[in-house]
Amino acid sequence: MQKVTDGRLARGEARRELLLDAAVSIVGEQGLGALTHRAVAAAAAVSLASVTYHYPSADDLRRAAFEHAGSRIGLEFLWLVTRAAEEPDALPDICGDFTARLVTERRIDTIAVFEMILAAGHDPELGPVKRLLELRLARLLTPYVGSDEAAFTVTAALQGLVLTALSPDRAREPGRLRVAVSDLIRRYRATPGGPVPPHVAPPPAGEAPWNPSSPP
């Protein structure tokens, strides 16, 4: 009986992964307005009933898609935190590489996350996910730039640079983004040429780096 139950759970998880991959692709390629149960069913090549079973309402589907995109961006963030812990003095270049990856390898996920940021303005339930996005990056930057206020300023500027780089006319210019981000963070360094304090350690094993229910 346990094996049967485990098998069903695994199939259910695989199906949700399939549906959310399709949902994120729709949002990233066509915009939030294109995200419907029927569109996900068609993109995932499953029945409409399968989508509504896992995500009964449009809000359920939208929030799950945003969290899924955020979790995949979170894997990139975990890479960033790990590298920063190993090479704290190289943080500007590491962040430059991170943002370049967001607009290339993780372009669709990143667009979906920005759709979430905009949607959070009128959907309070998305607020915690948005705030976690900003808080985790700011915590990483604080030791380098010297204060929480400066870290949140840099975080907001990074979001603006990434958003600009996502525009179609900038899609083939990740190198310019990398340089701009590295330069921005160097300009905000608390003590130019001085030592860099210890950075935020990687999240504990088992903690999802972008899970809105996990502590900041």
Label each region the model flagged.
Residues 126-127, 131, 144-210, 216:
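Hydrophobic/aromatic-rich alpha-helical bundle segments in the mid-to-C-terminal region
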Residues 18, 22-30, 76-83, 112, ...:
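Solvent-exposed, amphipathic alpha-helical segments
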